[in-house]
Amino acid sequence: MLKPLALATILLVAASSYCQKASEKSKRFKGMYFQWGYNKEWYTKSNLRFSLSNGDKFTVHKVKAHDSPDLDAIINVPTQISIPQYSYRIGFYLNKTKTKAIELNFDHIKYIATDYQTARVSGVYNGKIIDEQKLLDPQNFLHLEHTDGGNLMHINYVQIHHLLEKKATTKPLLNAIWKVGAGFNIPRTDVTWKGEQFNNQFHIAGYNISAEAGARYYFLKNIFFETTAKTGFVHYVNALANTAANKGNKVEHHFGYFELIGTVGFDINW
């Protein structure tokens, strides 16, 4: 959780410094914005394809999964703002009317394969070819989650449409907004294999594409609330599935998702 948050801080400082130089020299960007908020997800079923260091290769078919918003953590530990499923955006306006932007878009999502569901398992398991129904029991079989983050980092193109403007000014009051983008995944995968739990390291492990749409409301001059709905596709190509005793394990899977996001943001003008 801390690494993505630290990355957000570094990127914000770097982006601000870069944009100040850009505004002085090339006038390439017409302003920038920063947003922070939280999200909620729903996932499609996914086939988990395991490749273990002992030679076993098997697939757990049509696995159900859920998220874990953990919004109560903000009340219980107010300083730990990165415990819940958070989202941040750093955007750069491309025109004076601020209707077009390029955006760095990050979602800290939590993907949890639901325990104690029965799923078909096929392939080589314990050195034998199998095709049978198994219970996803962490003590006797396995558990998988990306709860230190599925962590979707991508670049968006943003289009903004002014719906309402403040009286006697040309400042926006209410905007419609849509975004499309693609990027990469930085998961930290927590695996329990026959009762042995291990939280793997962060690493780049695949790609994602998405589309997002919603509304942005300016309740103060340069401060806004944005709510959007987002849908996309995520492919974890080589997520680590190691345990303390066994290294070199990988899991590959992909799924679709639907997400609701609420953020507060502010514009920086020059």
Residue ranges and their predicted role:
Residues 26-34, 98-102, 170-178, 221-227, ...:
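Outer-envelope beta-barrel architecture signal
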Residues 46-52, 56-64, 214, 218-270:
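Predominantly the C-terminal beta-signal and adjacent terminal strand-loop region
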Residues 46-53, 115-121, 169, 188-197, ...:
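Outer-membrane beta-barrel translocator domains and adjoining extracellular loop/strand segments
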Residues 89-192, 263-268:
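Gram-negative (and chloroplast) outer-membrane scaffold detector with strong preference
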